From Swiss-Prot:
Lyase listed as a keyword: yes
Enzyme superclass (EC): lyase
Gene Ontology MF term list: magnesium ion binding; methylisocitrate lyase activity; oxaloacetate decarboxylase activity
S-S pairs: none
Positions with a binding annotation for substrate: S50, R159, H235
InterPro entries (alphabetical): ICL/PEPM (IPR039556), Oxaloacetate_deCOase_bac (IPR023687), Pyrv/PenolPyrv_kinase-like_dom (IPR015813), Pyrv_kinase-like_dom_sf (IPR040442)
Protein name: Oxaloacetate decarboxylase
Family stated for the protein in its record: Belongs to the isocitrate lyase/PEP mutase superfamily. Oxaloacetate decarboxylase family.
Cofactor(s) in the UniProt record: Mg(2+)
Binding site for Mg(2+): D88
Record function comment: Catalyzes the decarboxylation of oxaloacetate into pyruvate. Seems to play a role in maintaining cellular concentrations of bicarbonate and pyruvate.
Keywords, in A-Z order: Decarboxylase, Lyase, Magnesium, Metal-binding
Note on how the cofactor is bound: Binds 1 Mg(2+) ion per subunit.
Amino acid sequence: MPKASHQDLRRSFRALTSSNACFHTASVFDPMSARIAADLGFEVGILGGSVASLQVLAAPDFALITLSEFVEQATRIGRVAQLPVIADADHGYGNALNVMRTVVELERAGISALTIEDTLLPAQFGRKSTDLISTAEGVGKIRAALEARVDPEMSIFARTNAAIIPVQEAISRVQQYQAAGADGITIVGIRDFDHLAQISEGVTVPLMLVTYGNPELHDNARLAEMGVRVCVHGHAAYFAAIKATYDCLREQRQILGNESNMSATELTHTYTQPEDYVEWARKFMNVNE
């Protein structure tokens, strides 16, 4: 079977987002998971920023991974992927000029689409990690991303967090990112379908929702009807891999019992040691959360 080119995959992603259906992402974090996802029939995969941080650094999602490290992992995936892969490019690794560099590097890596979010990252001195940049700066980042793109088939999605801002502000941000030329809008923190209807009013570009498995948003037909073309439930496959690795190694060391009682979430917390980073942020950055 002939191998699809990066541009073929980008066209496939655009065909998905131009359809009337809602597609669910596979969490892909290395070349093997990308091949498995394609073989199982997933239409699209996503390389999460949080997962890349875990895979490359064994570190929590505190914007610690560098652009180079993220691109290296994306390149490994892009080398073998036979499904479109979305890159969660966080804040674009800096200001609008950094965003341009991010787009150039991820396009070369073979990514089909990427998201640029308006969270203030990395965490700033004395500021909450959930603070957002201004809408004007967010618009500038999207315009810069579009300027840097060489292959017009690659999709640029603007991302915002509806859970931490008033509805009217979320509506304004979404509409301004659309007006800036974003190929789509990614929204995190939608509570239910009424919330989605409010925020997506007037949006004509494709929507991507990050739901983390919210049971209030499980009606796929309704998601599709409301313009959602991509739904990200989270990264269960990656956390299942952590759990399986732990249990296998534990058994090899002949610790009594084939399986531990620790969940994947508990294992991730144990081995990424987030409390250290929280303490360092409090100690050196005056961040108390």
